[in-house]
């Protein structure tokens, strides 16, 4: 599926914030080392790195179902409820 992460987050009133989803989720993916209390495997870390690069270097990017599930899982752990909801809605369409 193609997803455009270069959109601004919105606050609780629906006003556009200065933060893009690509930049904020990209930071999480670039810096992640654990999921919950468990360390990520080398493959998961590499997937996070590749997703970070895709998201921050393109308008609309191709995301596999495995990558989408990984993003939903990671964002659910590391983002606020409002940010997580926006990312999940974007991915799940």
PLM feature spans:
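Positively charged, low-complexity terminal tracts
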Residues: 1-93
């Amino acid at each position: 599926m193609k997803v455009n992460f270069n959109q601004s987050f919105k606050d609780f009133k629906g006003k556009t914030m200065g933060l893009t989803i690509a930049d904020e989720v990209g930071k999480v993916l670039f810096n992640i080392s654990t999921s919950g209390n468990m360390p990520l495997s080398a493959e998961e870390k590499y997937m996070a790195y590749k997703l970070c690069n895709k998201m921050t270097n393109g308008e609309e990017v191709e995301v596999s179902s495995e990558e989408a599930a990984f993003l939903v899982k990671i964002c659910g752990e590391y983002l606020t409820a409002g940010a997580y909801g926006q990312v999940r809605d974007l991915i799940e369409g």
